[in-house]
């Protein structure tokens, strides 16, 4: 972690964590999207918070709203950095400071939380999303933002042009000035150096504070606005020639490998969430969780013992979290969270198992995501018969079977 250095610009980080995550249902049925477990021991929000903390930013407000109990608890338990130093990572629910209403959009969430900015009086405000899987040193983006002289910088990642229709797309000139910002266009623009590649917005922004406050207040008076950061606030600055694109490919993270440099995934769908897990488990993973120079921080609750393999139980090309027991069962190409039990004769292949899952004797689970505390009875088959699975569970376009929290099947 980078130490806070005297003379660095005063920065407040705001993490937007109020999203409902409808496309991840049923994983988001009882929790906010940033609270969804990921990678065996983490939650999605751990990635953005780790990036900020590793870069030395320790004044972080996490704006929450939708079913935030588990998210609030995770932040208070795993991210408690408060003390006499003035540092904090705080969960901030909707305050209704501007009337009896909840957040109506991401920009409105910050507008209703302007007291955080007035209290801290930062020079710059980082506004990052809470539900992406990646490593990034935000301080490099802040430094480039300051040099640009613009009021906002938008982090952009290069994606194939044909895939960019799912993102906010950035068109810029040779100097990095954003000339156009298009929300999910049918015909995405190319970059100045490659017409087959598009800058897609990562949903990460750095603002000069005064300009952000002015834009939020102007937006609040616009009856036609949806009060969205990407849809309304960023175009506000682009129209004024006051926006800069930060090329994520230039971000250098200590300890990154050539394979995972520039890795960023939007895990907003079941298929994307599943595939991102599969990126973790190869010998040379596409995304390496074992980078000690830029760790992903979290706290594993329960003081769990190490994973145990007994009676010939095996796990191949898999990640198995503490507290799990593989007893005469077989696990392949899977990610098992904490406190998972796989019993005699059971087979788990290409699966993501959340905390507390139980796989009964002789059961088979393939190409599936099982949410927290799911119990699979002895001899049950999941991911084997598509028609039967479709009648009982959600099956994604990519064929991933998802079983909701606490079900006994």
From Swiss-Prot:
It catalyses: alpha-D-glucose 1-phosphate + ATP + H(+) = ADP-alpha-D-glucose + diphosphate. SUPFAM superfamilies: Nucleotide-diphospho-sugar transferases, Trimeric LpxA-like enzymes. It comes from the Bacteria. InterPro entries: ADP-Glc_PPase (IPR011831), ADP_Glu_pyroP_CS (IPR005836), GlgC_bac (IPR023049), GlmU/GlgC-like_hexapep (IPR056818), NTP_transferase_dom (IPR005835), Nucleotide-diphossugar_trans (IPR029044), Trimer_LpxA-like_sf (IPR011004). It holds the Pfam family Hexapep_GlmU. PROSITE patterns: ADP_GLC_PYROPHOSPH_1, ADP_GLC_PYROPHOSPH_2, ADP_GLC_PYROPHOSPH_3. GO terms for biological process: glycogen biosynthetic process. Its EC number is 2.7.7.27. Alpha-D-glucose 1-phosphate binds at residues 168, 183-184, 201. Keywords: ATP-binding, Carbohydrate metabolism, Glycogen biosynthesis, Glycogen metabolism, Nucleotide-binding, Nucleotidyltransferase, Transferase. Involved in the biosynthesis of ADP-glucose, a building block required for the elongation reactions to produce glycogen. Catalyzes the reaction between ATP and alpha-D-glucose 1-phosphate (G1P) to produce pyrophosphate and ADP-Glc. Homotetramer. HAMAP family: GlgC. Belongs to the bacterial/plant glucose-1-phosphate adenylyltransferase family. This is Glucose-1-phosphate adenylyltransferase.
């Amino acid at each position: 972690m980078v130490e806070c250095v005297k003379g660095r610009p005063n920065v407040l980080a705001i993490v937007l964590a109020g999203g409902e995550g409808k496309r991840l249902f049923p994983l988001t049925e009882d929790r906010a999207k940033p609270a969804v477990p990921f990678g065996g021991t983490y939650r999605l929000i751990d990635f953005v918070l780790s990036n900020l903390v590793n870069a030395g930013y320790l004044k972080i407000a996490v704006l929450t709203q939708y079913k935030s109990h588990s998210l609030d608890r995770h932040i208070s338990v795993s991210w408690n950095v408060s003390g006499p130093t003035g540092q904090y990572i705080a969960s901030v629910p909707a305050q209704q400071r501007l009337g009896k209403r909840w957040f109506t959009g991401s920009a409105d969430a910050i507008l209703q939380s302007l007291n955080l900015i007035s209290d801290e009086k930062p020079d710059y405000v980082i506004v990052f999303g809470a539900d992406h899987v990646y490593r990034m040193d935000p301080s490099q983006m802040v430094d480039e933002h300051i040099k640009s002289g613009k009021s906002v910088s938008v982090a952009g990642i290069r994606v194939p042009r044909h895939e960019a229709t799912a993102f906010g797309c950035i068109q810029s000139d040779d100097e990095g000035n954003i000339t156009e910002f298009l929300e999910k266009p049918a015909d995405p623009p190319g970059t100045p150096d490659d017409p087959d590649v598009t800058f897609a917005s990562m949903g990460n922004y750095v603002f000069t504070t005064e300009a952000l406050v002015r834009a939020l207040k102007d937006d609040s008076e616009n009856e036609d606005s949806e009060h969205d950061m990407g849809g309304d606030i960023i175009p506000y600055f682009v129209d004024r020639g006051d926006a800069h694109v930060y090329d994520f490919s230039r971000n250098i993270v200590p300890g990154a490998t050539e394979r995972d440099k520039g890795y960023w995934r939007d895990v907003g769908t079941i298929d994307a969430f599943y595939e991102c897990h599969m990126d973790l488990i190869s010998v040379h993973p596409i995304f390496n969780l074992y980078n000690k120079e830029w760790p992903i921080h979290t706290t594993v609750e329960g003081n769990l013992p190490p994973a145990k393999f007994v009676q010939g139980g095996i796990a191949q090309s898999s990640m198995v979290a503490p507290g799990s027991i593989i007893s005469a069962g077989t696990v392949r190409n899977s990610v098992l969270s904490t406190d998972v039990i796989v019993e005699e004769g059971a087979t788990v292949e290409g699966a993501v198992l959340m905390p507390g899952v139980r796989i009964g004797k002789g059961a088979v689970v393939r190409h599936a995501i099982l949410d927290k505390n799911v119990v699979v009875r002895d001899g049950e088959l999941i991911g084997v018969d598509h028609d039967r699975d479709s009648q009982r569970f959600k099956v994604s376009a990519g064929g991933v079977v998802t079983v909701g929290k606490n079900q006994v099947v």
